[in-house]
Structure formats: C-alpha cells, structure tokens
C-alpha cells in the first residue's frame, strides 16, 4: 500500500478516538506517530513490500509507561496472517483503553459468541460395570 494511503487511513482512524496523528515520515522509514492526552504516544512502522522492507507492522513507544500496554498489539501483529493498518491501530487503541481512562473491552469473541447460549445438562449415564449374577 502506498504510504499516502496509509496516512489517509490513519487520519480517518483518528477521528473516532482520542489519538491524533502528529507525524508521518516516508523518507528513512515509513513511520506514523500518534499522541493522546495524558501523554500517551506510540508509533507504527509500516511494511514496505515494494522495496523489500519489513513485511509486518511494528508498534513501539518511546514512553516507558506506554510500552507494557503495547504487548497485546505486538503479540497480535506477530501472530499468523497479514494485518491491515486499521486492525493494528484498533488493537493498540484497545491496549491503551486503561491509560485513557476508558472501560476495558473484553476482546474474547469466543465468550461473547457463547454468552447467550444456555448449556444443556449432560444426560445421566448409567454406570457401566460388571454385573453380579
């Protein structure tokens, strides 16, 4: 994806959350820097498949306070399959929700999917054993 398209997608993503895109650089590295109050910052290095650069996105923060919260997003990026910039940014946003003072979102879709399903009781099975005759 062209870097300009990534910048446009990042700017659009910022309209739905507290983060602002504060810097976009395409010279040395395809880097997007984001910031939100109270002092939450991170950057995304974007893949550059055209010139043989990195294959995956990479997220990081210069802030020691922010780094532990990025672990979820880093694990997500390194998991199987290609990710889009919006998928990565959404995962970062979920990771930072506690720092932003927002309620935590349960990211476990399995539990959400089965939340309305009532479990049927297991049928009683007769004991199998040696009969005494």
From Swiss-Prot:
Whether Cytoplasm counts among this entry's keywords is: yes
Where is it chiefly localized? cytoplasm
Name used for this protein in its record: Maturin
- What gene is it encoded by? mturn
Please give the Pfam families that the UniProt record associates with this protein.
Answer: DUF4581 (PF15167)
Protein location: Cytoplasm
Which cellular component terms (GO) are annotated to the entry? cytoplasm
Q: Which family does it belong to?
A: Belongs to the MTURN family.
Can you name the source organism? Danio rerio (Zebrafish)
Q: Does the keyword Cytoplasm apply?
A: yes
């Amino acid at each position: 994806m062209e870097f300009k398209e990534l910048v446009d997608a990042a700017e659009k993503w910022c309209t739905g959350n507290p983060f602002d895109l504060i810097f976009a650089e395409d010279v040395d590295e395809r880097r997007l820097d984001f910031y939100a109050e109270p002092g939450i910052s991170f950057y995304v290095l974007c893949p550059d498949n055209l010139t043989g650069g990195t294959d995956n996105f990479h997220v990081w923060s210069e802030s020691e306070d922010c780094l532990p919260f990025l672990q979820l997003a880093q694990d997500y990026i390194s998991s199987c399959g290609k990710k889009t910039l919006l998928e990565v940014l959404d995962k970062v946003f979920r990771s930072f929700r506690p720092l932003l003072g927002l309620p935590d979102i349960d990211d476990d879709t399995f539990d959400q999917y089965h939340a309305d399903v009532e479990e049927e009781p297991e049928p009683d099975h007769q004991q199998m054993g040696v009969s005494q005759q």
